[in-house]
Amino acid sequence: MCYVSAGGCPTAFWGIEGGGRFMKKQWLLLMIILVLGGCDMQNRFLYFPNDDRPTAAMLASENMAFWRAAGQDYRGLISKENEAATSGTIVLFHGNGGTAFDRGFYLEPLGNLGFRVILAEYPLYGGRPGKVGEKSFVADGLETLRLAHEDYGEPVYLLGESLGCGVAAAVARQTSVPLAGLILITPWDTLASVAKSLFPFLPVKLVLTDRYDSIENLKNFPRNISVVGAEHDEILPIRHAHQLYQSLPEGRKRMWVIPNAGHNDWPYYADASLWKEITDFVKK
């Protein structure tokens, strides 16, 4: 350890030669630690998986059923009431907290508008096997979308909520299924942008292993996109939704801001007229 005196520390330690090498090594070591630990750091703040598989009694209480179940695995949940959908099918990717079962509140308003809604479940959520991460979620989402199209045909739409917007955007870019439109609720622009606002002192591009770059993924999306933001979003400040919206192709986008709503309570502020406007736009 060097104790600073009036004359300063020896040049061999702090000088241009020795000190420069020392500081570079320290920064290099810090970068290595951040990069090697990046996946763990990212996953701790981004994913909250659980093994709470819905029971038969739970599903019956909400009039839901497993969709595309195979052994102990399943792709998602579906309402028993809207099998004969007149408006098409919506594949819905939920946020990073909770499970598909917790998103039953989507079924009634969208079902009333004639949509069949598949509440897609992620790997390692809701008792499903697999692992978390963008690569895993997007690959799983692509297969879920393919199967939905196989089962029900067109039109098929994607709806993303929070993290699910990033999944939906990536799926929309990579799929060969002809999508009719896209709905994004409380979205971000890029994961790096969100991480930078949360951790301004970290080199987030080195730490992050997932990208979820919705700006890049949607820049050539050919159909209409409805973007819905919450005015008082305390988790993903609404500026991220605005930044994404500004980047989207002109003439094929529309944005709604739900007054007084936060990131998690916005459903209480979304009435039937809002749902109709949002879905009517993507149906054009």
Language model: regions and residue ranges:
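Acidic catalytic loop of the alpha/beta-hydrolase fold
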Residues: H232-L236, N264-D265
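An N-terminal hydrophobic leader/cap segment in hydrolases
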Residues: L36-R68, R75-L77
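Short alpha-helix in the alpha/beta-hydrolase fold that links the catalytic acid
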Residues: Y106, S214, R223, P237-Q246
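Membrane-embedded segments
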Residues: Y74-L147
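Gly/Ala-rich beta-loop-alpha elbow adjacent to hydrolase catalytic centers
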Residues: G160-G164, A168
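Short beta-strand/loop motif that positions the catalytic acidic residue
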Residues: F221, V227-G229, D233
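C-terminal catalytic histidine-bearing segment of alpha/beta-hydrolase fold enzymes
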Residues: H242-Q243, E250-K284
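Active-site nucleophile loop of the alpha/beta-hydrolase fold
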Residues: I183-S193, D210-S214
